[in-house]
Amino acid sequence: MSLKFKSIAAISALIGTLTLVGCGPTEKAPNHIKVGVIVGAEQQVAEVAQKVAKEKYGLDVELVTFNDYVLPNEALSKGDIDLNAFQHKPYLDQQIKDRGYKLVSVGNSFVYPIAGYSKKIKSLDELQPGSQVALPNDPTNLGRSLLLLQSVGLIKLKDGVGLLPTVLDVVENPKNLKLVELEAPQLPRSLDDQQIALAIINTTYASQIGLTPAKDGLFVEDKESPYVNLIVAREDNKDAENVKKFVQAYQSDEVYDAANKAFNGGAVKGW
């Protein structure tokens, strides 16, 4: 190989290396943020926040959708996304305790009340002894559902159980109801199961089959519920400017109006 050819080859190799370095994922776009949300009505609400963030703050929001409550925190912890907006504080606290996540709330969003739904009965007076009642199986929403059942007199829980009771804390069950724990996304479908008389469903999943607490719920969680949903970041990015911009965009009148529309009046402002 001639000296001249060697020089040309070396220069070409250097240019190629520089090109690869320049195009590599070494830095995130300065005005870009990835936000995890649950598919369905919450996604529709987040899409309005996405628009507000762009128009008011010049922030490009990429929405990443999930079908369950477990993966959004895992993705956030790994750095696959920058924020998520889907969970209430008791759930976040339990996830941090169980999985050691270094996650933190950076703002409130909405309270989405849970409610009791049925395709078999029209009132609780029709609920027969021994009926099966479907509940979400994750610890915080299970506890939330048991507290709701207690509030309407279907069960009684031990004193002092706090926000995380389990079925083992049921001390009175006058109708001998069979409490069946299911994955939250399965609860809407459980209404078609002939064995299930009643299901306690989060508004996020109920809305996916056209149900709303005010119109379709046999009984509904009180609006003073402590289960306000949160916008969550990692401890290492909680103070980032893009995070603050997204929170401001989400806590806007436009997003509140969108939430009320998406949930047919079932969203309560949490800020």
From Swiss-Prot:
Record Gene3D superfamilies: Periplasmic binding protein-like II
Keywords of the record: Amino-acid transport, Cell membrane, Lipoprotein, Membrane, Palmitate, Signal, Transport
Compartments, record wording: Cell membrane
GO cellular component: plasma membrane
Lipid-binding residues (covalent, S-diacylglycerol cysteine): 23
Membrane topology: Lipid-anchor
Listed SUPFAM superfamilies: Periplasmic binding protein-like II
Signal peptide: 1-22
Lipidation (N-palmitoyl cysteine): 23
Family: Belongs to the NlpA lipoprotein family.
Protein name: D-methionine-binding lipoprotein MetQ
The gene coding this protein: metQ
